Amino acid sequence: MSMIAAFYSNKSILITGATGFLGKVLMEKLFRTSPHLKVIYILVRPKSGQTLQERVFQILNSKLFEKVKEVCPNVHEKIRPISADLNQRDFAISKEDVQELLSCTNIIFHCAATVRFDAHLREAVQLNVTATQQLLLMASQMPKLEAFIHISTAFSNCNLSHIDEVIYPCPVEPRKIIDSMEWLDDSIIEEITPKLIGDRPNTYTYTKALGEIVVQQESGNLNVAIVRPSIVGATWQEPFPGWVDNLNGPSGLIIATGKGFLRSIKATPMAVADVIPVDTVVNLTIAVGWYTAVHRPKSTLIYHSTSGNLNPCNWYKMGLQVLATIEKIPFESAFRRPNADFTTSNFTTHYWNTVSHRVPAIIYDFYLRLTGRKPRMLKLMNRLLKTISMLEYFINHSWEWSTNNTEMLLSELSPEDQRVFNFDVRQLNWLEYIENYVLGVKKYLLKEDLAGIPKAKQHLRRLRNIHYLFNTALFLIIWRLLIARSQMARNVWFFIVSFCYKFISYFRASSTLKV
């Protein structure tokens, strides 16, 4: 029997960020492997027109929880939603709910964060730093708490090329940053943001680094650990391959490529695509919770959940497999035939963004206007290019993460636990994973039926014919404008045609000679 699964039986668990991608998969795995756990508290932000219980039912009614309902039919009774807002002081939780959390919680998984790369520094500090500080304060008042697991990111120290399993200092103390956010106005914060984040690419990575320091400084006597995942992608194995429900990371790129919106991207083809399946991150996180509670390490251990140093895959290989899979199972209503090229220079990137992205969008918007519809393609394309520009830093660099603690933890698990909570990324078959990823994007994100594949292929053939027709027409126009009006151009043209004719004639004659 799994020791880890048995450990979580009869436990009361608090999960922040449970309505997010990682949080949902974490909750599903806990219920599926430990159906006898006592309760999972989830902090849910109030939403107008929807009760907390309705939001829980919405989560449970997704395909992700189908297997859970078989092993834990009363799962809805074991989820206790608590109205909370991490943007508010003390999370705006009622006194009754606070008292219940303080007296009952055994394990905390802190998954909540803002993952927006362009978030204002005030917002990023509130969700990634201040909220962590407040949760630690609450945790310090929980007499039954056994472990506090903080989910950070492997890119919290992306300004370094080699990252160890340690917490790196920041020039300005987190407490000073938190205090300054309370009285500085937005314009001043925007002005000082570049100086604060330094050589990090955005406020997300900077504030996640601050959050780690807060965990180290303010955890007191708590048993704490930090998990640092890299780019979190679709499920690898559990509860089934390819499940994904957000546009973050590779998912948005796959859709943009498959729909024909994205034809060129600035990236280093041989750079490591450090994507990690979400179920791998979840299995490691659950194992870390068990190890931290049972073995009570003397210091805060950091665990890297990354793939590049153990089972690397580069962006070129990933791109080829994405295109090969899309050719077999194309997306419906594609804007253009799927194709994607890597560029490495700024000039080439700007050129293709204009010629291959914005100009076709403008032409399509003109067509929409002619047919009496609202133009939208250029606006959509500009949003896409802005998103891509924020990802460029991560697809043009490679990092090395040490994984000593992760490998140590794997060796501590029994064979049964290694099977049930598998986070050994060395077993991952990238070609198979990427194919399932693309299929999952089609089924779970785009909600497209596989029965529509023949029609989608027919649509792509139509787009191919339009492409050939357009190129032919463009060639004839250029010929008419340049060659037909210039004697020199005609001479060059006739020379090329004559040369090609003679070459073909020579090739045919030589191929008939008998040796």
Curated annotation (Swiss-Prot):
Gene3D superfamilies attached to this UniProt entry: NAD(P)-binding Rossmann-like Domain
Family matches, as Pfam families: NAD_binding_4, Sterile
TM region(s), chain numbering: 465-484
Gene Ontology molecular function: alcohol-forming long-chain fatty acyl-CoA reductase activity; alcohol-forming very long-chain fatty acyl-CoA reductase activity
Name of the top EC class for this enzyme: oxidoreductase
Gene Ontology CC annotations of this record: peroxisomal membrane; peroxisome
Protein keywords: Lipid biosynthesis, Lipid metabolism, Membrane, NADP, Oxidoreductase, Peroxisome, Transmembrane, Transmembrane helix
Subcellular location as annotated: Peroxisome membrane
Enzyme Commission designation: 1.2.1.84
Highest taxon, organism lineage: Eukaryota
Cytoplasmic side stretches: 1-464
GO biological process assignments: long-chain fatty-acyl-CoA metabolic process; wax biosynthetic process
Catalytic activity: a long-chain fatty acyl-CoA + 2 NADPH + 2 H(+) = a long-chain primary fatty alcohol + 2 NADP(+) + CoA; hexadecanoyl-CoA + 2 NADPH + 2 H(+) = hexadecan-1-ol + 2 NADP(+) + CoA; octadecanoyl-CoA + 2 NADPH + 2 H(+) = octadecan-1-ol + 2 NADP(+) + CoA; a very long-chain fatty acyl-CoA + 2 NADPH + 2 H(+) = a very long-chain primary fatty alcohol + 2 NADP(+) + CoA
Membrane side Peroxisomal: residue ranges: 485-515
Keyword Lipid metabolism: yes
Expression by tissue: Specifically expressed in the meibomian glands of the eyelid and the sebaceous glands of the skin. Also expressed in the brain where large quantities of ether lipids are synthesized.
UniProt-recorded name of the protein: Fatty acyl-CoA reductase 2
Organism: Mus musculus (Mouse)
Gene: Far2
